Structure formats: structure tokens, C-alpha cells
């Protein structure tokens, strides 16, 4: 079973999935909508769950370096509450601090228009990699 990483945005939401072994993550897609609508994003997630056999969802949580919440933090927390009502899977937060900065650095050579279309799925990949490397692997070692 695979993991799904999400970089949630009001307009653009990036998705990434793990490979079958949960060792690496791959950018999947960027979902674009005209305004923030949880239902549209949840429908997109349900499609991904059916297609890729997902067993865990990881959402990037934007927290300032001093652990202070922002409007974006509250938006993401509210989304998780809505998602939990619709989907019966474990859902984790991963601090996404700097994921967009790292994503932009990794695609720095691309033209700005193309970069805008993929930065969110690269951010989702970074979020999912963080989970796989720091949480999921630790959990596996703790079981043995």
C-alpha cells in the first residue's frame, strides 16, 4: 500500500505518492481550482485513493519557525477535520516549513510559467519524503 502526500493550497494543491515499498516518493499532480473548496479537493483525493491503493495520507502543515500558527495553518487544520469525516484512513501532519522554498530551488532552472505548474506537487513530494524518512521508517524500526 502507498502513502499520499498533500501540499494543500486554496487555489493549487499538490499531490505526491510513495512507491509500493514506501521508500521513495514521486510527484503526482497539481489540482487547480478557482477558489478554496474542500469538497472539490476531497473528490480529487478520493479518485487518487481508488487509483493508487493508498493507506495513509500525509498533509503539510504550515507552521512558523517559532511554532506560531498562521491563517494557512488553521485552513489546513480545518481541511483535515473535513477529510476525516469523508475518508477512513490515518491522516498525519508534517511540518511543511520551507517545503515550497526547497521545491522552488529544485526546479530553479525551469521557466517561471512551467515552474508554477509543478512546484506544488514537488512540495507534496518533499512533505511525503519527510514523513517516509522521519516518521514511517522510525515506526517500522520500533516494531522490530
UniProtKB/Swiss-Prot annotation:
Query: What Gene3D superfamilies has UniProt attached to this entry?
Result: YqgF/RNase H-like domain
- Lipid biosynthesis recorded as keyword: no
Q: Record's Gene Ontology CC terms? A: cytosol
**Listed HAMAP family:** Nuclease_YqgF
Instruction: Outline what the protein does.
Output: Could be a nuclease involved in processing of the 5'-end of pre-16S rRNA.
Family stated for the protein in its record: Belongs to the YqgF nuclease family.
What is the protein name stated in its UniProt record? Putative pre-16S rRNA nuclease
UniProt organism field: Mycoplasma mobile (strain ATCC 43663 / 163K / NCTC 11711) (Mesomycoplasma mobile)
